[in-house]
A protein has these predicted regions:
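Active-site/ligand-binding-proximal alpha/beta "capping" segment
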Residues: 1-29, 90-106
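Short glycine/serine/threonine-rich phosphate/pyrophosphate-binding segments
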Residues: 3, 27-38, 110-118, 141
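Glycine-rich beta-alpha junction loops
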Residues: 29-32, 54-59, 68, 113, ...
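Conserved active-site loop/cleft motifs that coordinate metal ions or position small ligands
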Residues: 106-109, 129-134
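Predominant activation on well-ordered alpha-helical scaffold segments within soluble catalytic domains
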Residues: 7-14, 35-38, 42, 61-65, ...
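A short, charged, Gly/Pro-tolerant segment at domain boundaries
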Residues: 132-143, 147-149
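Active-site/ligand-binding loops adjacent to catalytic centers
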Residues: 20, 41-109, 123-124, 145-158
Length: 158
């Protein structure tokens, strides 16, 4: 997984941004994406801030884990990550729904978390070129109620 992101995702991000990327924001599930992409970006001439995302204490975001240090996956290299942000489940879900309604991107909760984190980083760094990856699909969450009547009744559904 890290090798695939090192050889494909990292170079694609570099190419698509014309090397202008200043911040890479990635959810930390298996940590393959953040490990592979950050390794590639660190090898480029320009410094890029690498930011990992984990659920806030007490939040549950499918696909993103709050790893205790002793249980971090063996592929993870902490020296490649500059900062770890906590994301609240509500923010991840709200961003996921906003992406569906405003942008037509039907993604899942972990992608909502990644984009919520990227928006936070962009707001704190005007003019920055911030990249996040949409890493899951919304159809996997249809039965959970995050898009449905329960959420809508609480003012959050679409």
């Amino acid at each position: 997984n890290p090798y695939a992101h090192y050889t494909t995702t990292g170079p694609e991000i570099w190419q698509q941004t014309g090397g202008r990327i200043s911040h890479f924001v990635s959810s930390m599930g298996t940590t393959g994406t953040i490990t592979g992409v950050s390794r590639f970006l660190r090898e480029q001439a320009k410094p890029v801030s690498i930011i990992g995302l984990q659920p806030e204490e007490g939040s549950s975001i499918p696909g993103i884990r709050r790893w205790p240090a002793e249980y971090m996956p063996g592929i993870f290299n902490a020296s490649l990550v500059d900062q770890v942000l906590d994301i609240h489940q509500r923010d991840a879900e709200n961003t996921m729904r906003a992406l569906a309604v405003r942008e037509g991107i039907f993604c899942g909760v972990s992608s909502g978390g990644a984009v919520a984190g990227a928006i936070r980083v962009a707001n704190e760094n005007p003019g920055a070129v911030v990249v996040a990856i949409i890493c899951d699909r919304g159809d996997r969450y249809l039965s959970t109620g995050v898009f449905g009547e329960e959420s809508y009744a609480q003012g959050a559904g679409i």
